[in-house]
Amino acid sequence: MVWLANPERYGQMQYRYCGKSGLRLPALSLGLWHNFGHVNALESQRAILRKAFDLGITHFDLANNYGPPPGSAEENFGRLLREDFAAYRDELIISTKAGYDMWPGPYGSGGSRKYLLASLDQSLKRMGLEYVDIFYSHRVDENTPMEETASALAHAVQSGKALYVGISSYSPERTQKMVELLHEWKIPLLIHQPSYNLLNRWVDKSGLLDTLQNNGVGCIAFTPLAQGLLTGKYLNGIPEDSRMHREGNKVRGLTPKMLTEANLNSLRLLNEMAQQRGQSMAQMALSWLLKDERVTSVLVGASRAEQLEENVQALNNLTFSTEELAQIDQHIADGELNLWQASSDK
């Protein structure tokens, strides 16, 4: 039976122009970092993608190494794209990235032209696509000249394998340099993807949003819920069904060390504020990011389709009073949750 998308899907989502480009992204985008590997049930993935699109979420964000195992998120997404979304390809924004370890040997990681372009070809093959809408340099590579990384990104566009290019976890200074390098190729930098949330404000402290605005670059925030800390699930310890319980210290992600008393106190105060606003803590955290028009979109993950419905309700209240913002700032001690600092502080 052929699946048909909700005909009213565009009536309930906000869309924002990405920097100075003509491309608009949904205020909420779906990230496939977790829950889309071969270890996850395909039908659960299908339900999440269908629900997202039915809610007007048109942007699906991947990377070469998402899984587990690495590459499996792209493979699964490609299968579901063929089975359910083939007729809707021109209504989708599909992004992928390369930068972290992907295959053995000296050419399977980093920012070299060799790695980035080979990885893009592999990603297209896994997803069954002729092009992606956005291709990212996933991280700063200290051992590769930025000129080389920029040339690879430019080639991705010139070869028709990507419509736009972006960067992730670059400092303001490196972002400015990438803008200038791509300009030499007559390729605009479309978007920057930083880790940004109520508990991790390096984007504010560093002036990154000003750099992006001054250069007409969009911003899409990842880990907007601090990888689950801002959902409220950890207020009373570590639940057995939580990612922190499952993963421990095995991967870059949540660790029990993040549950400091300062962080827990911040979370409890935020939860009280959210209730006063008639929102869940997760909804308030998303609203807080989207109150700034310089933030084009926020990337949310989901293990269940119902979570997306709750997240979309955040768009109903993006207004904060001066008193609320001051109260948030007073409550929040920066939890030092920027796990990507090794890349973004350079």
UniProtKB/Swiss-Prot annotation:
GO BP annotations, alphabetical order: methylglyoxal catabolic process; methylglyoxal metabolic process
The entry's keywords: NADP, Oxidoreductase
Important for catalysis, annotated site positions: D61, Y66, K97, H138
Catalytic reaction annotation: a primary alcohol + NADP(+) = an aldehyde + NADPH + H(+)
CDD domains in the cross-refs: AKR_AKR14A1 (cd19150)
A Pfam family annotated for this UniProt entry: Aldo_ket_red
EC number(s) recorded for this UniProt protein: 1.1.1.-, 1.1.1.2
Lineage: superkingdom: Bacteria
GO molecular function (one): oxidoreductase activity, acting on the CH-OH group of donors, NAD or NADP as acceptor
Matching InterPro entries: GAP_reductase, K_chnl_volt-dep_bsu_KCNAB-rel, NADP_OxRdtase_dom, NADP_OxRdtase_dom_sf
Function: Aldo-keto reductase that catalyzes the stereospecific, NADPH-dependent reduction of L-glyceraldehyde 3-phosphate (L-GAP) to L-glycerol 3-phosphate (L-G3P).
Protein family (similarity comment): Belongs to the shaker potassium channel beta subunit family.
Protein's name according to its UniProt entry: L-glyceraldehyde 3-phosphate reductase
The organism of origin for this protein: Escherichia coli O157:H7
